[in-house]
Amino acid sequence: MPKLRSATSTQGRNMAGARALWRATGMKENDFGKPIIAVVNSFTQFVPGHVHLKDMGQLVAAEIEKFGGVAKEFNTIAVDDGIAMGHGGMLYSLPSRDLIADSVEYMVNAHCADAMVCISNCDKITPGMLMAALRLNIPTVFVSGGPMEAGKTKLSDQIIKLDLVDAMIQGANPNVSDDVSEQIERSACPTCGSCSGMFTANSMNCLTEALGLSLPGNGSCLATHADRKQLFLAAGKQIVELCKRYYEQDDTSVLPRSIATKEAFDNAMSLDIAMGGSTNTVLHLLAAAQEAEVNFTMADIDRLSRVVPCLSKVAPNTQKYHMEDVHRAGGIMAILGELDRAGLLNSQTRTILGMSIGEQIAKYDIKLTQDKAIHKFFRAGPAGIRTTQAFSQDCRWDTVDDDRENGCIRSKEFAYSQDGGLAMLSGNIALDGCIVKTAGVDESILKFSGKAIVFESQEDAVSGILGGKVQAGHVVVIRYEGPKGGPGMQEMLYPTSYLKSMGLGKACALLTDGRFSGGTSGLSIGHCSPEAAAGGLIGVVKDGDIIEIDIPNRRIELMVSEEELAERRAEQDKLGWKPANRQREVSFALKVYGYFATSADKGAVRDKTKI
């Protein structure tokens, strides 16, 4: 029988000092011997996805104590990628993921906590906490803040749905008036919650459902809806149950590594491909798998991307549907149900509810269950009222969307495409692979050949695009923006958005060793590995070189002879694989990150061989 970790600081005369301090936090005599459960919150007023989380920690804590645990809350940092976008702040986004993972480890191990409830929401917070949970391997439940409602506004006598990306694109479009641009800006982000499309934050929160580490509805139920409160309450109750099963019954099946197995990672990646999720999820799943000591690699992603169809298209891949529509269609359990019926899911993996994912689908998939309460839950919809308050409305759709032929979520037979929403490409310019969100690529440019136009930084690329240097037919190459070369692997949402603003969204490709926002669509290929700073061939591309892209055949090639490439490599060896004439201030903290960072194909985690 495993001993409570917290007994280290609560039992024995030699821990009198620690107990005295515990008492000063409010613990009573009968609390010693109960599991101490860390409530890992991420409230901040900087981030709309976290601005409503201030009281969520104590909501969960009260439920933990109601069912027999001792709850202790602490906070992590949280970076808003949208606000950090387009300037030096973006260098800090990806490194913050690892900092969050470390900070959770520090707090939990320093205080000998027995279990965790992780209250996350936005881009790097969920992955950072996920890495920590798999590293620590103590009972853990994830519950996120929930998605934002989609923005809505009236243009040309039509009501259209909006999100953050629309504000970015229209703001840079010279053909859009100031009044219309401001109208879109004011309407794009109406409520608290993670941005309303299938961007990185929502993608990751959905993947925690597929991994089995969060409750059904976690990825899709709106932040503003009263139903979301039940997820927080259920998380508090469930973590106490997991503690009892592990510490009192020696049931190791409740531990994160027992739940998030290789098969569960396959399920999560299959979900990501099926829903056309953010390419950032690839980075984060690779990183989380390493923490779980699971052998999940780019080869697995390639394998799955060749067989899993695209079953759901959500913004930014279409403006018709946002997360509120995914929830109405049955949420993640509905997509997993369609994958299961197509024979594309490992249905025996376990979940925090103590059942298999197959059993969970049978209970929560609206196509399988007649449970009125579950159908009511998935009818939870938007109110269309600007607010920063959680649980502030209880509006419902009249019906669920169970149309699997023409609805938001499709069956395999009626898939948006039989080819999945994400693909891994490889070739001489990306020997270790690169990633493209095929769900966001127009069919007319699935095969593309063009002349390279090379930029040594995102900032230069933005200037080149807005200044008219980039023309139709170009392959925009942005290099030295990888984990090591940035350092920090910036998102390239502004370059991709500005290509659309300039009318080049379907006329150009973009290739980078950096990464993309979950809001990116178009022929945008990221995570090129090895990155330029690690000696990757993207570092030797010159203006005018032909780059051929073939998504159906998963190939990308730099059309330069081996003799010429050898000469260019030798030249870069002498120069140290550094960007030419780039002026960028890099802090000591970022230099440390860059020194240890691996390329994207390894999840941009720290290179353990350097320690």
From Swiss-Prot:
E.C. numbers: 4.2.1.9
Cellular component GO terms, alphabetical: cytosol
Protein's pathway: Amino-acid biosynthesis; L-isoleucine biosynthesis; L-isoleucine from 2-oxobutanoate: step 3/4; Amino-acid biosynthesis; L-valine biosynthesis; L-valine from pyruvate: step 3/4
Keywords: 2Fe-2S, Amino-acid biosynthesis, Branched-chain amino acid biosynthesis, Iron, Iron-sulfur, Lyase, Magnesium, Metal-binding
SUPFAM superfamilies: IlvD/EDD N-terminal domain-like, LeuD/IlvD-like
GO terms of molecular function: 2 iron, 2 sulfur cluster binding; dihydroxy-acid dehydratase activity; magnesium ion binding
GO terms for biological process, alphabetical: isoleucine biosynthetic process; L-valine biosynthetic process
Catalytic site positions: 517
Residue positions binding [2Fe-2S] cluster: 122, 195
Binding site residues for Mg(2+): 81, 123-124, 491
Family statement drawn from the similarity comment of this UniProt entry: Belongs to the IlvD/Edd family.
Subunit field text: Homodimer.
NCBIfam families found in the cross-reference section: ilvD, PRK12448.1
UniProt function note: Functions in the biosynthesis of branched-chain amino acids. Catalyzes the dehydration of (2R,3R)-2,3-dihydroxy-3-methylpentanoate (2,3-dihydroxy-3-methylvalerate) into 2-oxo-3-methylpentanoate (2-oxo-3-methylvalerate) and of (2R)-2,3-dihydroxy-3-methylbutanoate (2,3-dihydroxyisovalerate) into 2-oxo-3-methylbutanoate (2-oxoisovalerate), the penultimate precursor to L-isoleucine and L-valine, respectively.
Name assigned to this protein: Dihydroxy-acid dehydratase
Organism the protein comes from: Histophilus somni (strain 2336) (Haemophilus somnus)
